[in-house]
Structure formats: structure tokens, C-alpha cells
Amino acid sequence: YASLDQKRQYTFSYTEGYLTQVNEKIMPREGSSDAVVAHTLSLQYDKGDLISTTSPSLPNESSTGYGELQTNYEAGEDINYYRLPCMLVADTYPLSFHREALFAGMLGKPTQHLTTASCPNEPSDTYTERTEYTYSFDKNKKPVSLKVSTKYGNGKSISYLNRTISITIE
């Protein structure tokens, strides 16, 4: 991927068909004294289900101390018959700018079960959050919608994302 200001290079790594790592290198434009910047997203699976992602925190995310941010995922009981990707992985840097990767097969094999929740690895006494993914199904158990809501330790919650899922099987 290249723009006028920079060139981005990606390397995707897979284990048994599952995406386990994305490496991004951002090269400055030719003649610039800027350094090459690199980011790595790591994904871990257990029995075909995504259990965690680890990514670099970005400078504007002071809550993570500019280190790594690990998010843990929970698989539900619904089998992922329609091979849907975990939608919120697309919001994890460096994939956050490349959502088309979800459907281009670059994310590798989908999880065995639909993901039902995620949360940061290190909740504190003063701040906790848990994001839940609620799927609606038609009479044939085909997912037709996804509601994402985040609940915070202070008792507040927010539903911030509703997605309609449209699946055509040919």
C-alpha cells in the first residue's frame, strides 16, 4: 500500500490456516529523515476459537501506557456455519484501516464459534469494561444482525454499534 507521503508494507503469518500475526512497516517518503515505524498484531486461538489479540497501543491511548494492549475474547456456543469473521478484530490496529481484509480472505480461517464477548486483559480496580456481541438469527439459524454493546465497571453501558448481516449462499 502506498500514498504520496509513505509506503506501508504488510506481512501476514498463519498457523493451520488461522491468522496469527500481522506486521506493518511504515516507510517514510524518499528523502525523509523519519524512521521506519513497525507495528505487530498477534492473534491466539484455542481449538479454533480466537482467545486474544495483542497489539501496540498508540500514542493517543494513554490508558495503556504506550505498551501493548491485550484483548481477550470469548466464544459462544453458536457454531460459525457462515464463516463470519470476528468483526471487532477489524478495529484492532493495524487492521483498523483495512477492513476489506476481513472479506478478502487475509484473516485466514474464521473461528469455529461466533465470538460473544471481549475485554481488555488488565482491568483495574477503577476501570473495567466488557464488550458483548449479540447475534440475531432467522428461523434457519442464519445470523441476520449483530449488536455490539460495551458495559463499564461504573454501571454505565452503551450500545454503540448495530450491524445488519446479509448473507447470500449460492
Q: Predicted segment positions?
A:
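Buried hydrophobic residues that stabilize the cores of well-folded domains
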Residues: Y1-E170
